């Protein structure tokens, strides 16, 4: 394994709660706190998601040892529409050729979610069993992965353990200064 430089980002949030505003009010202090906390959590999760997608975009592979039947240009595998249902099954051999034989995590957008749902319609008791295309992967969906013009779906394939979040609390925050 290689030595990586960890880039830290500081995230901080806050909101105001004034107890006297909730006296004689239909909205309780707890209800308003929970609503505000939910907004903060969603915004924080979206910020982390955007940072993760940016890291995936910046770290795309530049070399494919075996691109199978696909075109590979500008660090992107172009999938023809007629092969859209096959790419999920082909990701494992492509990753294995680049020495990533482990469990694959797929980070995709709504177009990939739609593709997986269409593949799932062809299960074990249907006309064609398409489960092998997608069943040995872990899927994560986000609206922060965007399609290029005239594309139906975009995803990143990452081996398990290659992307993560480290938590570090600044000393000043621990000391409340």
Q: Where are these predicted regions, by residue range?
A:
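Flexible, glycine/threonine- and acidic-rich loop/arm segments that mediate assembly and lattice contacts
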Residues: 1-100, 112-125
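Sequence/fold signature of self-assembling virion shell proteins
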Residues: 79, 117-177
């Amino acid at each position: 394994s290689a030595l990586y430089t960890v880039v830290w980002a500081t995230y901080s949030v806050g909101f105001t709660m004034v107890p006297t505003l909730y006296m004689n009010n239909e909205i309780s202090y707890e209800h308003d706190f929970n609503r505000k906390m939910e907004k903060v959590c969603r915004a924080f999760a979206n910020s982390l998601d955007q940072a993760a997608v940016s890291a995936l975009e910046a770290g795309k592979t530049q070399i494919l040892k075996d691109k199978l039947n696909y075109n590979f240009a500008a660090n992107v595998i172009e999938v023809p529409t007629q092969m859209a249902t096959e790419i999920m099954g082909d990701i494992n051999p492509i990753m294995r050729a680049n020495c990533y034989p482990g469990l694959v995590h797929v980070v995709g957008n709504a177009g990939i979610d739609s593709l997986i749902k269409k593949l799932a319609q062809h299960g074990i008791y249907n006309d064609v069993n398409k489960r092998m295309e997608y069943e040995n992967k872990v899927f994560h969906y986000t609206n922060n992965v965007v399609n290029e013009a005239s594309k139906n779906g975009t995803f990143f394939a990452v081996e398990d353990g290659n992307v993560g979040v480290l938590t570090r609390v600044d000393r000043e925050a621990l000391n409340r200064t």
